[in-house]
Amino acid sequence: MTHDLQQKSKLSAVEKIKAKSRYLRGTIQEGLADLATGAVVEEDTKLLKFHGTYQQDDRDLRTERMRQKLEPAYSFMVRVRMPGGVCMPKQWLQLDELARKYANNSLRITTRQTFQFHSVVKRHLRSTIAGINEALLSTIAACGDVNRNVVCHNNPYLSPLHKTVYEWSKRLSNHFLPQTQAYHEIWMGKEKVAGTLPENEEPIYGETYLPRKFKIGITIPPNNEIDVFSQDLGLIAIAKGSRLVGFNICVGGGMGMTHSEPSTYPRLGDVIGFCTPSQLLEVAENILKIQRDFGNRCDRKQARLKYTIDSRSIDWFKAELNQRLGWDLEPARPFHFESNGDHFGWVEDSKGRWHLTLFLLSGRIKDTLDQPLMTGLREIAKIHKGDFRLTTNQNLTIANISKTNKPRIEALLEKYRIPMPERFSPIRQHAMSCVALPSCGLAMAESERMLPGFLARLEAVVEKAGLADEPITLRVTGCPNGCSRPYISEIALVGKSLGRYNLYLGAGFAGQRLNKLYRESLTEDEIIATLSPLFEHYARERQQGEHFGDFVVRAGYVDEVRAGREFHEVRSEKAVQSA
């Protein structure tokens, strides 16, 4: 592989850990058995990600535990691999039980169309992951330097085309699944065959896997709910009528960056061509292998595919791909996107089956005094004969409901006070957040916990400006890594320090343009005060059909970002103001 040419002395610490891990085994077994601590050793925390779990600690308790001379309150986040976001009712009930037995009595829908469990302590980690597998699901490759959960349009019942695209998400997921037996040995108690390990347990990945995570998503125009341009490999389904004819190939998207390091930036993917369905696996595998072979293994901040492309060129990438394929991609086919949000409420398909998409703020499923959401969805799962579909916007579709079962589900929604989505404002429906504090070790500020209160204040300002019915995308993240895909949101708050956020404006409503830093290190009060006159200006002078993100660019509040490397550029006469 080309990365072998990189000087081994300069390889990142994680690369060295992977190389000696014996295909992700490390000393995880020994660490799980050591109950004298709630943690595992540092090297194994890197390997556990490939198994679908992150070691964390409760940051709300850090200071007090330090004062008491106790180790941090360690726990683990466990993420499910669920291509296309499909969950059957029986699986829902099994995951619900695991969350109540081993986690923090909640489930969280992620921005990659799957579930996360939080606050799983080490002594329950094996039981939790084994339980997920007993539900015929898995956690392998939900995290780590591999292909992550493959996302696609959330409802395959809407048309034959949607069903075909969903099937492709499963095929891609299975094709790039790690082959190591370490997962089954550690979590399901499979005995390792005596003797040495196979010479190569990973025919696609190799012993050091990828330089960084790799994300694949499929979308069907005109909806871009998966934010296809944010994917390492984005696939835009091209159809004639309801028949899939192929995919436009989009490469090099990614959200993460680091504050004050302009060499790191979000990037939207480039559309480089078109392939037929029969060519897709070959194309996808070779794109992943180019990243495997040429991705930066010395600096993890430069290790995503977006930097591999920008450090050489998109023309180099296309030439390398065509050379490996032995043939050229066809020219990309025309397409058009209208939005990157979900379509809420009841929808009836051509076969008379019903589908209901619910709005779930931040994807959090838990019981509160005002709304026993987790209990209500559990009761629905007990009678539901269809399935559940998770969306990449952290919402939930109860899918494939028969005409006779629809009234029963409606009755349960009312009984457990689960509101219909039309009760929520458009800006709330288009809002997302990451988890952030107290569990995420990278968070610099609140996100999920601050969003409800902030949204209420923002809704009042929007309503005062006469924009209560205007859809505007809002995303909040506790750090610049961008798990809620903030840099393709019309308004984005990115945590800078506790209680302070960088304010970004100007992304495209359909996720087709990056936003730009407008103000730095603002408090919530300052953000509200900053946005209020912009909303009033927008209400007065917007053009017919003009979205807020387009307006702030046209009005000159921020410059249009045409490429990721322009993201940090600031015109001298529009220098970013610090609070």
Swiss-Prot record:
Keywords annotated in UniProt: 4Fe-4S, Amino-acid biosynthesis, Cysteine biosynthesis, Heme, Iron, Iron-sulfur, Metal-binding, NADP, Oxidoreductase
Positions annotated to bind [4Fe-4S] cluster: C434, C440, C479, C483
InterPro entries linked to this entry: CysI (IPR011786), NiRdtase/SiRdtase_haem-b_fer (IPR005117), Nit/Sulf_reduc_fer-like_dom_sf (IPR036136), NO2/SO3_Rdtase_4Fe4S_dom (IPR006067), NO2/SO3_Rdtase_4Fe4S_prot (IPR045169), NO2/SO3_Rdtase_4Fe4S_sf (IPR045854), NO2/SO3_Rdtase_FeS/sirohaem_BS (IPR006066)
Cofactor binding annotation: Binds 1 siroheme per subunit.
Pfam families in alphabetical order: NIR_SIR, NIR_SIR_ferr
GO molecular function: 4 iron, 4 sulfur cluster binding; heme binding; metal ion binding; NADP binding; sulfite reductase (ferredoxin) activity; sulfite reductase (NADPH) activity
GO cellular component, one term: sulfite reductase complex (NADPH)
Function according to Swiss-Prot or TrEMBL: Component of the sulfite reductase complex that catalyzes the 6-electron reduction of sulfite to sulfide. This is one of several activities required for the biosynthesis of L-cysteine from sulfate.
PANTHER family cross-referenced by the UniProt entry: SULFITE REDUCTASE [NADPH] SUBUNIT BETA, SULFITE REDUCTASE [NADPH] SUBUNIT BETA-RELATED
UniProt-recorded name of the protein: Sulfite reductase [NADPH] hemoprotein beta-component
UniProt lineage: Bacteria, Pseudomonadati, Pseudomonadota, Gammaproteobacteria, Chromatiales
